[in-house]
UniProtKB/Swiss-Prot annotation:
Keywords: Chloroplast, Membrane, NAD, NADP, Plastid, Plastoquinone, Quinone, Thylakoid, Translocase, Transport. It is found in: Plastid, Chloroplast thylakoid membrane. Gene3D superfamilies: Cytochrome-c3 Hydrogenase, chain B. Belongs to the complex I 49 kDa subunit family. NDH shuttles electrons from NAD(P)H:plastoquinone, via FMN and iron-sulfur (Fe-S) centers, to quinones in the photosynthetic chain and possibly in a chloroplast respiratory chain. The immediate electron acceptor for the enzyme in this species is believed to be plastoquinone. Couples the redox reaction to proton translocation, and thus conserves the redox energy in a proton gradient. It comes from Populus trichocarpa. It is a peripheral membrane protein. This is NAD(P)H-quinone oxidoreductase subunit H, chloroplastic.
């Protein structure tokens, strides 16, 4: 009797780059032993657009429309980090009203980003209903953005020394109404999701990251705080006017996918508290430091020459970057978003290095999903919260 030989080869499966749960064009080459994941190799770069090199050939104002394409679900943070660098290099003072407006916009953007994380995350693990619910509140936030900036996404609102325009009449009251309404929405999410036994089976104890591992891997944001490390750059770096508000850092100690969910849910309620305090205490005054506007020297032109008619009729604003090195960072929804900037006494940066939180947080994915089940990949990847525009840059 011939006994059939048992094959011990692992099955190789390509997950992505067009898988609906990949949150962008991410490709995972998986080695499977039945349902068990033996190995994982992430393949990046499908959305690489050379954002760092583009920055070296643009002024700060010219580069602002590009930065909103990194994390296109939280564009206020990419704009904030882009103008914070030149402001610190030039020691530029931001008016108090502009700082309050920035904080309001940043926290609204944080809520919108967390909402669009929550919906697809629940859909990935089988809960379709919250995916449709989150768009109610998200639409209200985008209405506020559109009223203030003219754009629902890709706002191009922040400027060196302030913001592009003041808040329109009635915007503050409309935003306060949203905050009151949104708190009831968060309570509905928690009632629907947090104690759901099927949800808990899918996320509890899945993708555990210890505090030591989180620090060694350089994780940040909810990934770090869910592992028991109370690290929030809004408290650590004291940027903008966050110190003037009463709010707490959200953290958990379990380090699993459930802890990361709870951190983000808690952050949305804390963001509402910050926004409400900022709306009630926003001062008057200018929304922009007009003294920061420096212009290129205008060359002697003939009235009807080619350059006057076809290239430019007025000079565009330019900010000369001092010959210094600087690293600036903000607490984005996904973690620490940083810029390493080198100026060389010109309008263009000599070097512009981006530190994207999604790219750093994604590095731990192969370790987390080894020896897990195939279905757990979507739970772990969804709990990390990545945007491939930011990962690939």
């Amino acid at each position: 009797m011939n006994v059939p030989a048992t094959r011990k080869d692992f099955m190789i499966v390509n997950m992505g780059p067009h898988h609906p749960s990949m949150h962008g064009v991410l490709r995972l080459i998986l080695s499977l032993d039945g349902e068990d994941v033996i190995d994982c190799e992430p393949i990046l770069g499908y959305l690489h657009r050379g954002m760092e090199k583009i920055a070296e050939n643009r002024t700060i104002i010219q580069y602002l429309p590009y930065v909103t394409r990194w994390d296109y679900l939280a564009t206020m943070f990419t704009e904030a980090i882009t103008i914070n660098g030149p402001e610190q290099l030039g020691n530029i003072q931001v008016p108090k009203r502009a700082s309050y407006i920035r904080v309001i916009m940043l926290e609204l953007s944080r809520i919108a980003s967390h909402l669009l994380w929550l919906g697809p995350f629940m859909a990935d693990i089988g809960g379709q209903t919250p995916f449709f619910y989150i768009f109610r509140e998200r639409e209200l936030i985008y209405d506020l953005f559109e009223a203030a900036t003219g754009m629902r996404m890709m706002h191009n609102y922040f400027r060196i020394g302030g913001v592009a325009a003041d808040l329109p009449h009635g915007w503050l009251d409309k935003c306060l109404d949203f905050c009151d309404y949104f708190l009831t929405g968060v309570a509905e999410y928690q009632k629907l999701i947090t104690r759901n036994p099927i949800f808990l089976e899918r996320v509890e104890g899945i993708g555990i990251v210890s505090a030591e591992e989180a620090i060694n891997w350089g994780l940040s944001g909810p990934m770090l705080r869910a592992s028991g490390v109370r690290w929030d750059l809004r408290k650590v770096d004291h940027y903008e006017c966050y110190d003037e508000f009463d709010w707490g850092v959200q953290w958990q100690k379990e380090g699993d996918s459930l802890a990361r969910y709870l951190v983000r849910i808690g952050e949305m309620t804390e963001s509402v508290k910050i926004i409400q305090q900022a709306l009630e205490g926003i001062p008057g005054g200018p929304y922009e430091n007009l003294e920061t506007r420096s212009f290129d020297r205008e060359r002697n032109r003939e009235w009807n020459d080619f350059e006057y008619r076809f290239i430019s009729k007025k000079t565009s604003p330019a900010f000369e970057l001092p010959k210094q090195e600087l690293y600036v960072r903000v607490e984005a929804p996904k973690g620490e978003l940083g810029i390493f900037l080198i100026g060389d006494q010109s309008s263009f940066p000599w070097r512009w290095k981006i530190r994207p939180p999604g790219f750093i947080n994604l590095q731990i994915l192969p370790q987390l999903i080894k020896r897990m089940k195939l279905a757990d990949i979507m739970t772990i990847l969804g709990s990390i919260d990545i945007i491939m525009g930011e990962v690939d840059r």
